[in-house]
């Protein structure tokens, strides 16, 4: 990271913050009834939702279908996200969080 220009470093920080905000938006939607269409809207068209407990959903249609089941499965949820590790590499990024919910 020391070889980056100031502009590149600022862009990286802005990208990381945008990813955090997206994750927080997702959490708020989950905690407001797991609305399938709203959940899918925070993903790219070819986005992937993955969980050890619930499997993998690829794309908006599969994500919406998965979350339709969650609407009746969960009467309450509270997503508390912490300890993000976000790796930015050009136009792509990966992130992991701890969740207490």
Tell what function each PLM region has:
Residues 1-36, 41, 45:
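Short, low-complexity N-terminal intrinsically disordered segments enriched in polar/charged residues
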Residues 35-101:
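A solvent-exposed, acidic/Ser-Thr-rich amphipathic alpha-helical stretch
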